[in-house]
């Protein structure tokens, strides 16, 4: 029998249960809204809907190609970045990390400025007397944008694997005279192949659920994904039943991909070494030339679109656009949504990790993993699917709200939780390993422990998680695409309206402001803990 001294639910378990229950309830509510709105007899017609199967096949095909084109070059780029030290290397690695949170529409705008029919390369070809035939629309444009986003991320993750190789192995290989193919096969490949499957699965999942990229560069019915078909069913055809059916298909596919990614991630093992930082630079001439070529090609992929956003944004329309009240209303809307979503995301993530940490400390590993998985399962319901469920749920009950602030904030916070989990889970475990027994012996627990230990020791990870969540929210377009209107517009939604109305110069200014806002917000939040903040 439970007593006051032994409550039925321990206090340390309540935060995680509340956060997990909230996310599971929201997901179930969205799922039920989709299920109840799906036509009862429609499932039998799916097999006869040729266009629907074309959309499903294209979604898988473009995601597969994007993963291959991102991971294969990343293997060689990661090796080049590991072996070479050059001025600006740290800046390049930071740029590789920033592409993951770069607003999609900003990158698309830069890609169009470089590779479009009137872009930089087209002008260069014309000066050389050649004809520029590449079109950034359709499958090739989608692949180009996906590689721009995911190749740097894959390179960073594979570089971490190369840095995990024990220095003793590299020294032994150098003593044995291993070079080239043999060194790659026997030393580097066993470590890379552990990381490649989960990285490829993650990129495949992100590209499969891509929305803004396909919406901007799809180019027509032949290049449409499931998420874009959901958006079209709601925004243009207003067919909630078809949108619900498509959203269920999308959710099932994403759930399978999430579980596959989690399964593959278990194969990664950390490296143990007593020789930290030792590396064989492999200074043969052809190795140096090959590495330099790979690094230059990576710079040519990443820098021109970003430079194009800055150059095109400084045009004659700049003073006129800056004087428009609509622009600053969109800036304010984006900022308040991003900050609110970021704070909510970090709070929910800490609630999950707090209870998960306590469960792991009590050797209840399965329960702790299950609690953490509840935060990752939100990836099975991409933003457009979650927003569709909310749309149908509200439309069939109390009606759509005049202001979509609450829905957008809540949805963006949920979508950022997996990223915040990845940032905070290892620091939380380190804090437990260092101070867990001390806190237990001193009787420090609950709010007191949070204030005295976690909030002080986790200043930098908390700031980084908040920065990621805020910038991911400020650049989001998938959720706002459903609820945005003339009275509720964020900067990405305003940029999409400008691009759609062929106001390219105005759009260039907005893209520049959005880019500067993201980098400024990310930098300021990261510096909140101060230069001398400690994490131990």
From Swiss-Prot:
GO terms for cellular component: plasma membrane. InterPro entries: MetI-like, MetI-like_sf, ThiP_ABC_transpt. Residues 56-261, 331-525 form the ABC transmembrane type-1 domain. Coiled coil: none annotated. Pfam families: BPD_transp_1 (PF00528). It is found in: Cell inner membrane. Disruption phenotype: Insertions in thiBPQ cause a defect in the transport of both thiamine and TPP. The chain crosses the membrane at residues 16-36, 58-78, 95-115, 134-154, 199-219, 240-260, 291-311, 334-354, 373-393, 404-424, 463-483, 506-526. CDD domains: TM_PBP2. Induction: Expression is repressed by thiamine. GO terms for molecular function: transmembrane transporter activity. GO terms for biological process: thiamine transport. Its main location: membrane. The complex is composed of two ATP-binding proteins (ThiQ), two transmembrane proteins (ThiP) and a solute-binding protein (ThiB). Belongs to the binding-protein-dependent transport system permease family. Part of the ABC transporter complex ThiBPQ involved in thiamine import. Probably responsible for the translocation of the substrate across the membrane. Is also involved in thiamine pyrophosphate transport. This is Thiamine transport system permease protein ThiP. It comes from Salmonella typhimurium (strain LT2 / SGSC1412 / ATCC 700720). The gene is thiP.
């Amino acid at each position: 029998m439970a007593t006051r001294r032994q409550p039925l639910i321990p206090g340390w378990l309540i935060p995680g249960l509340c956060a997990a229950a909230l996310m599971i309830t929201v997901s179930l509510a969205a799922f039920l809204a989709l299920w109840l709105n799906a036509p009862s007899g429609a499932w039998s017609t799916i097999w006869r809907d040729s266009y629907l199967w074309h959309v499903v096949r294209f979604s898988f095909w473009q995601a597969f190609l994007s993963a291959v084109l991102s991971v294969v070059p990343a293997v060689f780029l990661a090796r080049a970045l590991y072996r070479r030290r050059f001025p600006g290397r740290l800046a390049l690695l930071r740029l590789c990390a920033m592409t993951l949170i770069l607003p999609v529409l900003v990158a698309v705008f830069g890609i169009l400025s470089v590779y479009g029919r009137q872009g930089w390369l087209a002008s260069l070809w014309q000066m050389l007397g050649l004809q520029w035939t590449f079109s950034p629309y359709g499958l090739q444009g989608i692949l180009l944008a996906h590689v721009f986003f995911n190749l740097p991320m894959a390179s960073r993750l594979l570089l971490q694997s190369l840095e995990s190789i024990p220095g003793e192995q590299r020294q032994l290989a150098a003593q044995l005279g291993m070079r080239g193919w043999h060194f790659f096969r026997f030393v580097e490949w066993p470590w890379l192949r552990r990381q490649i499957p989960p990285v490829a699965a993650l990129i495949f999942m992100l590209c499969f659920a891509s929305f803004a990229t396909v919406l901007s560069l799809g180019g027509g019915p032949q290049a449409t994904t499931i998420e874009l078909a959901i958006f079209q069913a709601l925004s243009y055809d207003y067919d909630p039943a078809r949108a619900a059916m498509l959203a269920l298909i999308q959710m099932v596919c994403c759930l399978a991909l999430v579980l596959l990614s989690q399964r593959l991630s278990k194969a990664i093992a950390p490296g143990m070494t007593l020789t930290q930082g030792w590396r064989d630079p492999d200074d043969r001439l052809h190795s140096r030339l090959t590495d330099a070529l790979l690094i230059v090609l990576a710079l040519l992929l990443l820098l021109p679109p970003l430079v194009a956003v800055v150059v095109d944004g400084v045009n004659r329309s700049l003073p006129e656009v800056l004087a428009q009240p609509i622009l600053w209303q969109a800036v304010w809307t984006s900022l308040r949504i991003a900050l609110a979503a970021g704070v909510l995301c970090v709070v929910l993530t800490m609630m999950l990790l707090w209870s998960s940490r306590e469960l792991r400390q009590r050797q209840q590993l399965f329960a702790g993993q299950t609690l953490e998985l509840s935060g990752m399962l939100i990836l099975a319901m991409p933003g457009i699917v979650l927003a569709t469920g909310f749309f149908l749920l509200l439309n069939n009950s109390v009606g759509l709200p005049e202001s979509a602030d609450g829905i957008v904030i809540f949805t963006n916070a949920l979508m950022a939780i997996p990223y915040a989990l990845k940032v905070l889970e290892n620091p939380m475990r380190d804090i437990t390993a260092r101070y867990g027994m001390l806190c237990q012996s001193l009787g420090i627990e609950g709010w007191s422990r949070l204030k005295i230990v976690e909030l002080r020791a986790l200043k930098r990870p908390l700031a980084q998680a908040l920065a990621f969540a805020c910038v991911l929210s400020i650049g989001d377009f998938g959720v706002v695409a459903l609820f945005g209107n003339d009275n509720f517009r964020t900067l990405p939604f305003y940029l999409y309206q400008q691009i759609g109305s062929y106001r390219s110069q105005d759009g260039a200014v907005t893209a520049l402001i959005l880019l500067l806002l993201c980098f400024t917000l990310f930098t300021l939040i990261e510096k909140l803990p101060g230069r001398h903040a400690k994490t131990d």
